[in-house]
């Protein structure tokens, strides 16, 4: 798809109010948001994705937090990606698992797995309280080409699911969840490895992973998938060890427990 054509209607962007950051304690987040609608939705989504935006329903958003640049857009350059010994082991462990690319239609089977994952991994988060109607909206409210990658074992049991957008230069992992009772399978890692392989098989150069946030237990893992690229000062460039060290320093906790109460971490 060629998205170089001009958009024939104005695009409006809005800034949200401040709210507690879901990734780093003691920080506040703000977002810039815009609606993805109309005949140019695919073109707009492609452009916004390359500019560091993410999609939720028919909304594209990006962080604009005052005094904080912790959320770094990251993508894997799949043609240069190489399997480590650990990742080969993960693939072998899941040799009997098959991936199916299915339409973005919510099922109760998916939702039951989604609930188990949320309660186990993110029990204190807003998504843990989602009902089936909310889950269906997350999956099906999309103005662009979206599907679900389902991972099933040899008994056809659903082990993992990844809501996935298709861009003109890659795949975008919107949200993934998996069986929390099978840690030996490393299903989260296996899903990423499978998506890397799928992206490459489709002749596309990038797998977009969303935001990398150093020192966040939810988001820090993404820098381990290299070679990767990050969006820095408006341009994509290779992620370096210096970037990782710099982000780890910038995202260290603002508050930490001490014997006398709380410390600001500024000593």
UniProtKB/Swiss-Prot annotation:
GO cellular component: cytoplasm
Enzyme class, broadest EC rank: transferase
GO molecular function: arginyl-tRNA--protein transferase activity; leucyl-tRNA--protein transferase activity
Primary localization class, coarse: cytoplasm
Localization per record: Cytoplasm
Enzyme nomenclature, EC number: 2.3.2.29
Any one GO BP annotation for this protein: ubiquitin-dependent protein catabolic process via the N-end rule pathway
Region (Disordered): 246-267
Reactions this protein catalyses: N-terminal L-glutamyl-[protein] + L-leucyl-tRNA(Leu) = N-terminal L-leucyl-L-glutamyl-[protein] + tRNA(Leu) + H(+); N-terminal L-aspartyl-[protein] + L-leucyl-tRNA(Leu) = N-terminal L-leucyl-L-aspartyl-[protein] + tRNA(Leu) + H(+)
Keywords linked to the UniProt accession: Acyltransferase, Cytoplasm, Transferase
Pfam families per the UniProt record, alphabetical: ATE_C, ATE_N
Record-stated family: Belongs to the R-transferase family. Bpt subfamily.
Functional summary from the UniProt entry: Functions in the N-end rule pathway of protein degradation where it conjugates Leu from its aminoacyl-tRNA to the N-termini of proteins containing an N-terminal aspartate or glutamate.
Name of this chain's protein: Aspartate/glutamate leucyltransferase
Lineage: Bacteria, Pseudomonadati, Pseudomonadota, Alphaproteobacteria, Acetobacterales
């Amino acid at each position: 798809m060629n998205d170089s054509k001009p958009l024939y209607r104005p695009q409006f962007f809005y800034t949200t109010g401040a709210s507690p950051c879901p990734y780093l304690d003691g920080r506040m987040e703000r977002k810039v948001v815009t609606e993805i609608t109309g005949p140019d939705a695919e073109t707009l989504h492609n452009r916004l994705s390359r500019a560091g935006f993410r999609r939720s329903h028919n909304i594209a958003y990006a962080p604009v937090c005052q005094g904080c640049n912790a959320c770094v857009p990251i993508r894997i350059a799949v043609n240069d990606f190489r399997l480590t010994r650990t990742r080969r082991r993960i693939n072998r462990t899941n040799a009997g698992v098959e991936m199916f690319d299915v339409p973005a239609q919510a099922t109760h089977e998916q939702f039951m797995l989604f609930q188990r994952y949320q309660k186990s991994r993110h029990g204190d988060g807003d998504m843990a309280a989602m009902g089936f109607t909310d889950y269906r909206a997350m999956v099906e409210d999309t103005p662009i080409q979206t599907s679900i990658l389902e991972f099933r074992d040899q008994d056809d049991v659903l082990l993992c699911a990844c809501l996935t957008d298709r861009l003109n230069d890659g795949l975008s992992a919107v949200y993934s969840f998996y069986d929390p009772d099978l840690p030996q399978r490393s299903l989260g890692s296996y899903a990423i490895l499978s998506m890397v392989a799928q992206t490459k098989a489709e002749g596309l150069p990038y797998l977009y992973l969303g935001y990398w946030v150093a020192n966040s237990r939810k988001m820090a893992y993404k820098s381990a998938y290299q070679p990767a690229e990050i969006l820095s000062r408006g341009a994509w460039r290779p992620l370096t060890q210096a970037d990782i060290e710099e982000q780890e320093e910038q995202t260290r906790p603002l508050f930490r427990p001490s014997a006398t109460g709380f410390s600001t971490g500024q000593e």
